[in-house]
A protein has these predicted regions:
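Short functional linear segments
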Residues: 1-49, 56-58, 62-67, 74, ...
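Redox-cofactor binding/interface segments in oxidoreductases and associated redox assembly factors
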Residues: 19, 141-142, 163
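ATP-dependent carboxylate-amine ligase catalytic core
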Residues: 26, 30-40, 66-156, 168-182
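Conserved beta-strand segments that form the floor/walls of ligand-binding pockets within enzyme
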Residues: 46, 87, 162
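Short histidine/acidic/glycine/proline-rich micro-motifs that form metal-
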Residues: 51, 167-168
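Short active-site-proximal "capping" loops at secondary-structure junctions
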Residues: 51-53, 78-79
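Conserved beta-strand/loop subsegment of P-loop NTPase cores
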Residues: 160-167
Length: 182
């Protein structure tokens, strides 16, 4: 299978595991993480905000790598390939590793038939499972939509939380004021 076929297979597998965005908050994500052995215990820097999350995350990842740390960088969205969302020491993991992670998620979902995950929830569970196995010194994790129900809030050991400038985006989901959004 060539590179493009592999990433197409990863995307198809991910889509086969997801439902329309789950309204369960983190309840289903917590169940999946519990079955996975809680793959969210790695040391992390958690980044939220409206503007500048990706740039801030990339800069922090670069500084950590320059200082000799093994890093993971998890961002969204991707431009051309899902693998862009997770870099280990600045490099994409192979599609085969993502397929392994998604197979593990599939096994868990078969054990928990009541659980439905949205796309970002399943992707985050797979990414955290991969990060845990890569034994990084630090992970830089960018929120998705953000807010209290974001799947990246499953992090157990944030070393630092960073909030970049906030705007009034996604008010229907996150709140009607900057303090509610934050």
């Amino acid at each position: 299978m060539d590179r493009f076929e592999c990433w197409d297979a990863v995307e198809k597998r991910l889509n086969s595991l997801t439902s329309p965005e789950s309204l369960s908050g983190l309840v289903f994500v917590e169940k999946v993480f519990e079955e996975l052995g809680d793959p969210s215990r790695f040391p992390a820097i958690h980044i939220a905000g409206t503007n500048g999350k990706g740039s801030t995350a990339a800069c922090l990842d670069s500084m950590l790598r320059a200082a000799g740390y093994k890093t993971a960088l998890y961002t969204s969205p991707h431009l051309t390939c899902l693998g862009e969302r997770l870099l280990i020491d600045g490099q994409m993991l192979g599609g085969e590793k993502w397929l392994d992670a998604l197979e593990r998620i599939s096994v868990v979902l078969k054990k928990l038939p009541e659980v439905r995950l949205g796309y970002f929830q399943a992707l985050t569970a797979a990414a955290f499972w991969l990060i845990e196995r890569e034994k990084v010194d630090a992970a830089v994790i960018e929120t998705g939509l953000g807010g209290r129900l974001d799947a990246t809030n499953m992090l157990r050991r944030p070393l630092l939380s960073v909030i970049t400038p906030l705007g009034m985006d996604h008010m229907h989901l996150l709140g009607n004021s900057l303090s509610e959004i934050a």
